[in-house]
Amino acid sequence: HQKAKQAIDNGYFKKGILPIEINETYINEKNKRANRTYTIDTDEGVRADTTIEALAKLKPAFAVKGSVTAGNSSQTSDGSSFVMVMSEKLMNSLGLKPIGRLVNCASAGVHPRIMGIGPIAAVPKVLKQAGMTQDQIDLFELNEAFASQSLAVIRTLNLDINKVNINGGAIALGH
């Protein structure tokens, strides 16, 4: 949440968010129908006021002595996104500027009982296919269904934490 809040405050997401105007009908405090209009232009799930102390007080979600809580799990979010993947030739013909480059891709499976650790198998595979090392990667965007799963990936792959989800991940921004 802290990384996502900082990214929002610094305007990092502004160019990537299309503001949506909402016209809402609701029942007000006088139990009467009312209307209001507002604009959504910022991710709503980020809890800027979350503290380590507050998170430590949350009860486990799945097992009595478990580590997964509502505070270290991603919320379900309402949003959408898209990306355009195209050849350099098409990009140039359309006069577009790239924001990234797809160097290679790979898929890898892990045992289904261990959810969320696919990158442990996929990252070394794709790096080998591309003839690259982790040091050549500037940023790792890992899904964060649960913090424990993300930490397992980061620790097993020995990733530089300063290169992982630098603007927040799914725990703050949504799954």
Predicted regions and their residues:
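Short, well-ordered amphipathic alpha-helical segments that serve as non-catalytic structural scaffolds
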Residues: H1-K3, V85-K89, G116-A130, S148-L151
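N-terminal extracellular/periplasmic Venus flytrap/periplasmic-binding protein-like
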Residues: H1-S93, T156-K163
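A short structural micro-motif
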Residues: K3-Q6, A108, F146
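Beta-strand segments within the central parallel beta-sheet cores of soluble alpha/beta enzyme folds
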Residues: I17-I22, L96-S107, D135-E144, K163-G169
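Short glycine/threonine-rich loop-to-helix capping motif typified by GTGT followed
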Residues: N31-K32, P112-P119, E144-N162
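Active-site pocket-shaping loop/turn-to-helix segments
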Residues: E44, G66-S81, V103-Q129, D138, ...
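Phosphate/pyrophosphate-binding loops at sites that engage ATP/ADP/AMP, CoA/4′-phosphopantetheine
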Residues: M91-G95, P124-L139, I154-I161
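A glycine-rich, aromatic-flanked flexible loop/lid motif
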Residues: M91-R101, I117-P119
